[in-house]
């Protein structure tokens, strides 16, 4: 926060290091830093535990979870991480951005889409939820027709 100037964005070769007792404490600290000056941007983690990667992606307000990579370089895209090359990362609606991904050439193309009528496919709720209702022994399946 404001009392810790190195917790904000730095466009200089400075590394801020924080200590945490465990993963949950580290996640809480990362969330505080994101909410100060980074909401929507990205979070990096070095781990082999997929559940922790998923937890960060679900719980933190970020558009990118950088896994086992040099965060500084990985957010800008790479041939080996699937992110498009960019010097400008969108932070989604968390930062009132119109994009939540790496700004790249596709954002500057005008693409015309041709739309024609196609046969409609409406969801049949009874069929859609049938397996769930049967597995969970619920009577709600009968009420879907109402």
Regions found by a protein language model. Give the residues of each.
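Conserved C-terminal structural/oligomerization subdomain of aldehyde/semialdehyde dehydrogenase
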Residues: 1-146
């Amino acid at each position: 926060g404001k009392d810790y100037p190195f917790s904000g964005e730095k466009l200089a070769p400075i590394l801020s290091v924080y200590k945490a007792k465990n993963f949950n404490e580290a996640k809480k600290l990362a969330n505080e830093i994101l909410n100060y000056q980074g909401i929507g941007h990205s979070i990096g983690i070095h781990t082999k535990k997929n559940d922790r990667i998923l937890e960060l992606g679900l719980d933190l307000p970020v558009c990118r979870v950088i896994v086992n990579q040099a965060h500084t370089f990985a957010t800008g895209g790479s041939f080996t991480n699937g992110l498009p090359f960019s010097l400008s990362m969108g932070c989604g609606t968390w930062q009132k951005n119109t994009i939540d991904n790496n700004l790249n050439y596709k954002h500057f193309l005008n693409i015309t889409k041709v739309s024609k009528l196609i046969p409609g496919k409406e969801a049949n709720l009874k069929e859609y939820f049938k397996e769930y209702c049967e597995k969970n022994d619920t009577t709600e399946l009968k009420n879907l027709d109402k």
